[in-house]
Every structure is written in C-alpha cells, then in structure tokens.
UniProtKB/Swiss-Prot annotation:
GO terms for cellular component: host cell; host cell endosome; host cell Golgi apparatus; host cell nucleus; viral capsid. GO terms for molecular function: DNA binding; structural molecule activity. A motif (Nuclear localization signal) lies at residues 1-10. Minor protein of the capsid that localizes along the inner surface of the virion, within the central cavities beneath the L1 pentamers. Plays a role in capsid stabilization through interaction with the major capsid protein L1. Once the virion enters the host cell, L2 escorts the genomic DNA into the nucleus by promoting escape from the endosomal compartments and traffic through the host Golgi network. This is Minor capsid protein L2. It comes from Human papillomavirus 17. Disulfide bonds join C19-C25. Its main location: virion.
Length: 524
C-alpha cells in the first residue's frame, strides 16, 4: 500500500497575506502576525520601565553581562582621586626636506688666469651675501613614544655654509588638569564661624567688654570698691573648631544585654516559680552577713566567708530546733544573688533545700525554698531651706515672759548689781545715788509704725491690722544694715493715717483681746 505524501501546511504569514485583504483572518493569526497577543503586550509595556539589556540572560554564561552581578543594596564603587588619562591623537608628522641636494663642502675650480698665490682664509666663517636670503624651517613634531626626531637640513645660496637647526628632543608636553568633586553626605565642613556674643571678628579672637547693661540687686555705699573686689567666674567661649561629645546614659550593668536577659530569665524560673519553690521573706539582718547562724548553732569562724554554697549535715532522726524557725530542716543554702524589685529595692536572695523526709534507701526528699530579704531605702537628710533675702512684711512678735531669762534679785539692795565695777572713789557715789526705778528706764525707742498685726487662728481666716504712722516729738532711732547681701523688696502701697498726739507720755496704741487669755498693752 503506497503511503500518501505529506503536504506542507501554509505558514501563518502566508495565511495572513491571503486573508487580510478579504477580511477573513482568524483572530489568533492577526494577533500573532501583528504582535498583539497578551505576551507581546506584557513585553511592550514592561520594557518601557525595565531594561534587561547587557545582562547575559539566556546566554548560558551566567556572568551577568559586561558589568557582572552585585549583591542587593550595593553597587559598583566610584574610584576617586585617580590620575586622568590624556588621550593623544596619533598624528603622523610630515617630513620637510631640502629643495636641492647640494654637497656641503663644495670645491670651486681655479681659473687659469688667477694668480698662483692662494690667500689662506678662515673657512669656518659664514659669509652670506646681502642679496641672498637664508631660509630656515623649524619643525616641532608631536611628542610620541615611537616616532623619530628628524633634523631639518637648511640650504643657502652658493658659496654659503649650511646651518643645522636641531629641535629640542624633549619639548614641553601640553597637559590638562581636571577636577572632579563627589558629594559625601556624611561629611560636612564648616567654613564660617558661629556669631557669638562678645565676638568682634570671624576669627578666633574674643573681646569682652563690661558696662553693656544688667541690673544690680542691692548694692553698697561704695560701689567702686565692691566692683573691684568682686570675682567673676571665667568661661571659655567655644571655638569653631571645638565640639562636644554627648554621652548617652551609661549602662547599669557590665554584663551584655543578651547574657543578662538569659541569666535573669533562668534565675526567675528557679526562684519565683511558686509551684516548685517556696517563698520565704527573711527579716533577720543576719541573713545578709552570717546566714549559717540562722540554720544551726555553731561557732563563728572569722576566716570563713559565707559567699559560697553551704551544706549542713544533720541527722533527720534527731529533732533539732534551728535558731530561726524559718530555716527548719535546711540542708543546703546557695550563694547569694542580687536582683531589683519592681519597686526599685535591692533584693538579696538565696536558694535553699529542705530535707524533711528520708526514705529507707537513704534518699532525702524536700522542697526548694527561696529565702530573700529586701534592703531598705536610705532616706535623704531633711535640710531646712534658708532664705536668701530679707522680705518686707514678715513681722515676729516675741513674748518676753515666755522666752526671757529671769534673775531673782532684790532691787532695793544695789550690792548685787555692782558686780564688775572697779573700786574707785565713784563707787560710793553710785551706791548712794542708786535708785531701783532707773533699772526700768530704757533709752532706746522702738518704732512700730508701718507694721502689721495678725489676729486669729492660723488655720482659719486671719485679720490684718496696719499700725498707723505717728509723728511725735520723741527720739527717733535709726537702724543701719551693716551686712552685705541681696535684699528682696516687694512694692506695696499703704494708706496710713498720720496722728499727732498732744501729750507724748500717753500710750499710742492700746489693743484689747476679747478672747480668753488676758489683756495685753502694746506701747511703742
């Protein structure tokens, strides 16, 4: 049976040519020929934003093209500071030769009619006729490495010497200097100084003047002397080249954070697990220095430091009472550990184990106990704040019978009052003219004008009474403040009434208290 011959089907291009004019082309043929398929659209739209040229994709090499591959987040570095490469064109120099080839040493024939005596002349001298012109050609070839330097040959007229002009074998090379600047955002140069108070120039010179202003509080009678005696603390002005390093908060522990967290978590699991560990708060201060004295009665060894784990041997069959009931049946007491409570206190902890039960095989069974004690806080000293100035309006009334000292003497006998008087002829006169009424007289006159008296309970509302200013013919006393300091005065305006008394011996102010406690008489 003869096999039928396979007929080649028409290609997509042939079908498109025949059916395009008639308009009977299938959609898949049109999309494939006109490149309007979904894959073609993705490539068209994606190629406008992404360029994959030169990467060597689908080449089988895997080298990344001409530039190679770089890790993510990095890129090719830029070489800064390299010497620029000067590009020089390879120009072939043009050779210029002489116009005529003439021997340098020319022999002139002798005329038969010339005399037989030959005059000897200097042949090295150059004799150029005035009518002849000398042609000199200078050639400066382009400096190359593999080119030879040709020496031009210059010829003159007849009966003249040749002049050779040799060019400089190393002519000056033309160079070009270029400058490239790269911006580094992590480095910044300050090219100007910061304008500061007291600075008169942009350089590091500071001029400090005085008398530009300010306010003086208080003062003294001689301001020139006080100004000369005052000492001012000098402060250095920062320069434009100076800087300060701000240090952060120093760490509270020397252990790294990761190790500290791991150790703290394991410590909390061992100490604060209430299902496996019994929590006991110790109040005895011996727990900090000698915890073994709380477990059993023993002698103190000053050479032994109780900073390690301690083991206590005891017979369970024998009943022994410990010094502290909380440390009953303790056979092991661990080394101290220090931690911080949520309230900020320092806690000293020791992990112990009790041996409450003993089996027939000799095994001891007991619970783990967490003994801890919180160190109390150290309160700061309460210091009384002192006032830095004298404030007006603060008045203190001192009651003499309460805060005074009494001396029991007989004023009718002047003997005890003459203590310290030297014996002299005037001593008898003093005893004779002595009068007990003179002891009650006082030359100083107190002035209470402008003062305030406050009545009432300090917890309740108080009443303030302003004492008026009086003008009487009495003696006036002056108080001079002889100490230096700051006086703070609050401006107040008071409406006082001036009263002129006709009789100066009459008391000025009489104040009566309606409350229980008696009556008091104040005389200025």
């Amino acid at each position: 049976m003869a096999r039928s011959r396979r007929i080649k089907r028409a290609s997509v291009t042939d079908i498109y040519r025949g059916c395009k004019q008639a308009g009977t082309c299938p959609p898949d043929v049109i999309n494939k020929v006109e490149q309007t398929t979904i894959a073609d659209k993705i490539l068209k739209y994606g190629s406008s934003g992404v360029f994959f040229g030169g990467l060597g994709i689908s080449t089988g090499r895997g080298t990344g093209g001409a530039t190679g591959y770089f890790p993510l987040g990095e890129g090719p570095g830029v070489r800064v500071g390299g010497a620029p490469t000067i590009v020089r064109p390879g120009v072939i120099p043009e050779l210029i030769g002489p116009a005529d080839v003439i021997p340098i040493d020319t022999v002139t024939p002798i005329d038969p009619a010339a005399p037989s005596i030959v005059t000897i002349t200097d042949s090295s001298a150059v004799d150029l006729l005035p009518t002849e012109l000398e042609t000199i050609a200078e050639i400066h070839p382009v400096p190359t490495d593999n080119l030879d330097i040709d020496t031009p040959v210059v010829s003159g007229g007849r009966d003249s010497s040749a002049v050779l002009e040799v060019a400089d074998p190393s002519p000056p090379v033309r160079t070009r200097v270029s400058r490239t600047q790269y911006h580094n955002p992590s480095f910044q140069v300050i090219t100007e100084s910061t304008p500061l108070s007291g600075e008169s120039a942009m350089a590091d010179h500071v001029l400090v003047f005085e008398g530009f202003g300010g306010q003086n509080i208080g003062g003294s009678r001689n301001a020139a002397i006080d100004t000369a005696q005052e000492s001012f603390e000098m402060q250095s002005w920062p320069s434009r080249y100076s800087f300060e390093l701000e240090e952060g908060t120093p760490p509270r522990t020397s252990t790294p954070v990761q190790r500290a967290v791991e150790s703290l978590s394991s410590l909390r699991r061992a100490l604060y697990n209430r299902r496996l560990t019994e929590q006991v708060a110790v109040t005895d201060p011996l727990f900090l220095s000698r915890p073994s004295r709380l477990v059993q009665f023993q002698f103190d060894n000053p050479a032994f430091e109780e900073e390690v784990t301690q083991l206590f041997e005891r017979d369970i069959e024998a009943v022994e009472e410990p010094p502290d009931r909380q440390f009953l049946d303790v056979v092991r007491l661990g080394r101290p550990t220090y931690s911080e409570t949520p309230q900020g206190y320092l806690r000293v902890s020791r992990l112990g184990r009790r041996a409450s039960i003993r089996t027939r095989s000799g095994a001891q069974v007991g619970a783990q106990v967490h003994f801890y004690r919180d160190v109390s806080t150290i309160d700061s000293d309460a210091l009384e704040m002192q006032l830095l100035g004298e404030h007006s309006g603060d008045t203190t009334i001192v009651q003499g019978p309460v805060e005074s000292s009494f001396v029991d003497i007989n004023i009718d006998e002047p003997g005890p009052l003459n203590v310290g008087i030297q014996e002299s002829p005037l001593a008898d006169t003093i005893e004779e003219d002595f009068n007990s009424a003179d002891l009650l007289l006082e030359d100083a006159v107190d002035d209470f004008s402008g003062s305030q008296l406050v009545f009432g309970n300090p917890r309740r509302s108080t009443t303030s009474v302003t004492v008026p200013r009086f003008e009487t013919p009495r003696d006036t006393g002056f108080y001079i403040h002889d100490t230096q300091g700051y006086t703070v005065a609050y401006p107040e305006s008071r409406d006082t009434t001036e009263i002129i008394l006709p009789h100066p011996d009459t008391p000025t102010v009489v104040i009566k208290f309606a409350e229980a406690g008696g009556r008091f008489l104040f005389t200025p």
